[in-house]
Amino acid sequence: MGWIRGRRPRHNLEMSEFHNYKLGLAKSDFSTRCQKQRCPVIKSKCRENASPLFFCCFIAVAMGIRFIIMVTIWSAVFLNSLFNQEVQIPLTESYCGPCPKNWICYKNNCYQFFNESKNWYESQASCMSQNASLLKVYSKEDQDLLKLVKSYHWMGLVHIPTNGSWQWEDGSILSPNLLTIIEMQKGDCALYASSFKGYIENCSIPNTYICMQRTV
């Protein structure tokens, strides 16, 4: 009996330690399972939080690209309008007499720039119907406004095949120091462009034109 009593406390101690050990393992296993179960949840939440951020970044980039495109378009439109704007005439020039309504009065001459396209003969007839003629260049000083012209317009200059000269509608010969004639196409008529240049063109091709009326 003494031996049995002596062993029971030891047995109880071992059982208690074994029970505590199993309890510790159970807690550790439970903690591990909890951590494993929580990780997908946390990752899912991270993805959910990342989605709005990614969407916001995508929207910001798209808006930035759109802004750059719009600025490029606006710049192109502005530059196009700048280089193709109508002739700006100084208002301080001396009085040059009466001109038809809406015509430009400049240094004893009246000018009108017509945007409708006609061939050379139709353009000439249109000017004559308004008691004017197609543009004649006779002086770089008195007609310095012609430096501002940006596009091509019919003027009253034609080629005479018999002698190879260029003449104005009134029969006068072109002075070589007034215009630089450039052969753009085969033809017997000439278009005026900027900086006192004339471009050879087929007379039957429609173009805009300039009418001119002398006041003196």
Curated annotation (Swiss-Prot):
Residues 73-216 are extracellular. The chain crosses the membrane at residues 52-72. Residues 98-213 form the C-type lectin domain. It comes from the Eukaryota. GO terms for molecular function: carbohydrate binding; identical protein binding; MHC class I protein binding; MHC class Ib receptor activity. Natural killer cells. Residues 1-51 are cytoplasmic. Functions as an activating and costimulatory receptor involved in immunosurveillance upon binding to various cellular stress-inducible ligands displayed at the surface of autologous tumor cells and virus-infected cells. Provides both stimulatory and costimulatory innate immune responses on activated killer (NK) cells, leading to cytotoxic activity. Acts as a costimulatory receptor for T-cell receptor (TCR) in CD8(+) T-cell-mediated adaptive immune responses by amplifying T-cell activation. Stimulates perforin-mediated elimination of ligand-expressing tumor cells. This is NKG2-D type II integral membrane protein. It comes from Macaca fascicularis (Crab-eating macaque). The gene is KLRK1.
